[in-house]
Amino acid sequence: MALPKTIMAFIAFISFLVSTTFAVDVFSTTNVVTYWGQGHDQKRLSHYCQQAEHDIIVIGFVNVFPDQGKGGWPGTNFGNQCFMGTYITPEGEETELLSSCHKIIEDIPICKAAGKTIMLSLGGQAVDGSKTYSVKTRQSAVYFADFLWRAFGPVSPEWDGPRPFGDNVIDGFDFDIEANGGANYEYMVERLRSNFATDSSRQYYLSAAPQCVLPDGNLGNVISSSAFDFIFVQFYNTPSCSAFNWAQNPSKSGFTFDSWVQFIRKGASRNAKLFIGLVGDHTRVSPHGEYTKDDSNYLALPDADKLIKAYMNKYRANFGGVMIWDALTSDENKLVTGTYSSNIKRLLLNNDPSRPTTTSKTMSSTKTSMSTTTSKYTVTTSTISSTSKISSSTWSMPTMTTSTRTTSSTATRSSTIVTPSTSPNPTTSTSTTSGHQNTTATTTEIETQTSKTFITTTSIWSSGTGIGTCTGIPTITTTPRYPNATFTSDTTGSPTMSDTTITLSVTSSMHQISDTTTTIPTFSTTPIQTSDISLSMPSGTTTSKHQSSGITIPGPPHMSTTIVPASPTKPGHSTTTAIVTTTFTSVCPTGITTVTTTYTTIYCPEATPMPTAGNPPPPPGMEWTTIVTTCTKCASTSAIMTVTYPVTVPSEPMTPTQVPGTLPPPGAPGTGSGIPPPKTPSNEPGSPGTLTGIFPPKPTMSVPPEMGGNGGDRTPVYTGGAGVVSPSFSVVVIVLGSIVYHIMQ
């Protein structure tokens, strides 16, 4: 079918618009790089992309190279994130290149919408030495580079070969070479740079992940002779030069950060950003083995703070931040103030000398001239009875059209994309992680930095609601589909304080709601430049106000309640109809956005408390959620803040009963879950073809068996860009729902 391909192409297009606006700030000294793809029972990529602390996420690994791969193609391993299906060459030979990575295909657009930079890592722990990966000749290097560019780079009509991540485009490649290094990798870098130059629409990056010993036998030469953007040094595994060793005695340690700075400054990577590589936890850094608390890998937060402070200030031109292996272990390392990676991000921001100091004092309201965009909907519903029969409620689904290409977009969360799919789990094994969210709806003191990379959130609503536009994101034009739903857009003046009003009508269980007109919602999109910000939360908690350059920030919602008993039409249990107007604060690319909305909700008083100013009910089908996000336009530098806003409650798709699989030890075959993978969707390559030159031939899709067949486990590589065994949305587009609706009509 063409429908899934149309949807994915649309998501990829919107992700491109957003990612060009929120690309990683390569000049920042506060970036956090996180490896993902090899964690034991790890969560989906989208889970980590919705956490503000991750700036660059490196997916691992392409762990088999063409010179060693079946059919002369590379092979991949992403743990539990792909099914067992692989591509087949035109000659009929099965390869090790995974073809059924549907979760990753769905999640990359979410990451791009959140401003994340997504890179793909090559190498990892070389389990079988030269049998695993190496580049034997210059011709092999060029072939491999072109294969990667065609398979994971921008979509090209000239390429009809494999696209493991669909139409998604990754932002660059990471070299985590831990065996057989040295010759020929410089030719890969040269060829990739040449390919990057053919696409001026976006920025691409190259990184390397050497171990801390200098010179590194596998990557030292290529780092010196070829230009890399990022160097992720693994300051663990090797005790003599580890970060842990530095923390014990900085003056006598063999910590090599200084030596690495001098090394890269003498070569082609002189402008590269250097990262301190750390492990995310001192337990379970390897899935099948635990390290003790006094091991020589894990660095406690107080020591990490000292290390960051010492080297960030010493080498500002080359210091880039911290690399963490890996997303899962960091997420499971629950500290008092959040996960390990979120604390590392906080330490980086705190130690950044460019971060302005914050002060608190009462904010005076000053009239400020600003233009805001107000979008209104008028929705008329018909009679509703207690028998749950709804006679033709007319909710319009507006036709959505995007304006011509601009440098902006509205990023909103869609339950069909953000929620991890509960379709049959792949038969591979790797990863579980619980996300870090700040669930306290209070005002947080702002911490700022110069980075431009973080999550942007706006509200989303069910069908029939309007979205106001934000400067810096694509303009969305809505057209009513039915005559009884109207959409207007007008411009108002300065923002004003708004109240939350709930009108209650208590009736018996058999009641009529006739000709009810609800206006939903008014969005006031107001860009605000501030040094300190007070956020209003829907929970009604008191917020402190800080100096804000004369900008008025809405206070907590207020509420007036009117109870009007209606004449019962039939005895029964009473229900309550509440008309709620509430205001909450969100963040858009241009600053703080105040969102005011009115909606109707019906509930049973016996089971649900009466709404109050401190406890406004969420819109129907939605719930309040609180996240920690970063505003890059709220002050002279970026600001971390806590915002609360409504999100759609996801509906879980029906799936067959699943039998958990057994995780095998590394390198051993495993047993499947008993649930076979689905057939490969139509947006992946089809029939074989023939290509000439240095490009690989087009593959034939390997289709997994139908239900009832047996799958198999794919053992994660487990190490790599941060290998620890050998010493070596948030936010998607709201218009997606409308596009799907109209396509299906």
Swiss-Prot record:
Transmembrane segment boundaries: none
Residues of the propeptide: 721-745
Gene Ontology biological-process entries: chitin catabolic process; polysaccharide catabolic process
Keywords: Carbohydrate metabolism, Cell membrane, Cell wall, Chitin degradation, Chitin-binding, Glycoprotein, Glycosidase, GPI-anchor, Hydrolase, Lipoprotein, Membrane, Polysaccharide degradation, Secreted, Signal
Membrane-topology descriptor: Lipid-anchor; GPI-anchor
Record carries keyword Endoplasmic reticulum: no
One Pfam family per UniProt: Glyco_hydro_18
Catalytic activity: Random endo-hydrolysis of N-acetyl-beta-D-glucosaminide (1->4)-beta-linkages in chitin and chitodextrins
Classification via SUPFAM superfamilies: (Trans)glycosidases
Ranges where the GH18 domain occurs: 30-351
Any GO CC annotation of this UniProt entry: plasma membrane
Region annotated Disordered, chain positions: 351-372, 395-446, 651-715
Subcellular locations according to the entry: Cell membrane; Secreted, Cell wall
Residues anchoring lipid (GPI-anchor amidated glycine): G720
EC number assigned by the record: 3.2.1.14
Major enzyme class: hydrolase
Gene Ontology molecular functions: chitin binding; endochitinase activity
Glycosylation sites: N438, N484
Composition bias type Low complexity, residue spans: 357-372
Catalytic machinery residues: E178
Leader sequence residues: 1-23
Family label: Belongs to the glycosyl hydrolase 18 family. Chitinase class III subfamily.
Job description of the protein: GPI-anchored chitinase involved in the degradation of chitin, a component of the cell walls of fungi and exoskeletal elements of some animals (including worms and arthropods). Required to reshape the cell wall at the sites where cell wall remodeling and/or cell wall maturation actively take place such as sites of conidia formation.
Protein name: Probable endochitinase ARB_07371
